[in-house]
Amino acid sequence: MKDKYIIYFISRTKANMIKFIENKLKENNLTELIPTHGNILTALYESDKKLTMKEIAKKIGKDKSTVTPLVNKLITLGYIQKEKSITDKRVTYISLTSKARDIEDTFNFISSQVRETAYKDFTPEEKEEFLRLLRKLNSNFKMENEK
């Protein structure tokens, strides 16, 4: 039975979380954004400064080649902007625009709804244990991939 396999549950949970986020974006008239844009916006909101593509990729745990099209889309949508470093023309910084700042409270509210839903009916101990096990699972695959 498929339900016995952890990968099945992880996959279904991810799909359900994405659908939940898509619904929340729609409810808040942010339909031009997709869930994966959230990682980039979060990195920029939390740093509260300009970041390079490399720094964004590292913060969200993705390859630069994966981040580039997402950043380009956010630029097209007007949420972020690129600017060249004054001291080193090889370096390009990414920063939030006023449009992104205008949705920051809504974005944070959606993020809190995701967390609340994820941990609904979890005791504090269950939450800690769940996070510990997820970190361990992630570490197992990360170590194998780095061989």
Predicted stretch roles:
Residues 2, 6, 36-37, 99, ...:
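N-terminal positioning helix adjacent to the helix-turn-helix/winged-helix DNA-binding module
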Residues 13, 17, 24, 60, ...:
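Alpha-helical linker/hinge and terminal dimerization helices associated
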Residues 19-66:
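N-terminal helix-turn-helix DNA-binding core of bacterial DNA-binding proteins
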Residues 2, 33, 111:
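Residue-level marker of regulatory loop/turn positions in helix-turn-helix DNA-binding domains and
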Residues 72-132:
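Charged, amphipathic alpha-helical coiled-coil/dimerization segments
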Residues 1-30:
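N-terminal leader segment of winged-helix/HTH proteins
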Residues 1, 124-147:
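C-terminal regulatory/oligomerization modules of transcriptional regulators
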Residues 42-46, 108, 135:
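Short, locally clustered residues in the helix-turn-helix/winged-helix DNA-binding domain
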